[in-house]
Amino acid sequence: GAGVGARYDDHQIAIFWLPELYDLILAVDNYCPISGVNIIARGIVGDIEGEPVVASPLYKKHFSLNDGRCLEQPEHQLRTYAVRLIDDELQVAARTDEDVAA
């Protein structure tokens, strides 16, 4: 599962395809709130207790790719994005607070 950075509106997002774990495409902010750098797309992708995560490359903090929360420091969070692949087009939409709560 490799990540790729992309522009979305006025900021960067990190998109991950996880065929070996879940056959999912997931997207979160590329900006790491701990390091202050757009670097999440270069993080190491894995699984912690069944949850897909990305480890920030600088401080190795794990962020859930499902809901964006930092597992070690819950006060830090990444925004998550709804992603779908239609034919050969990747469609991305920002999630609302209601989407995350559901």
Write out the residue ranges for each language-model feature.
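Short cysteine clusters
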Residues: C32, S56-Y59
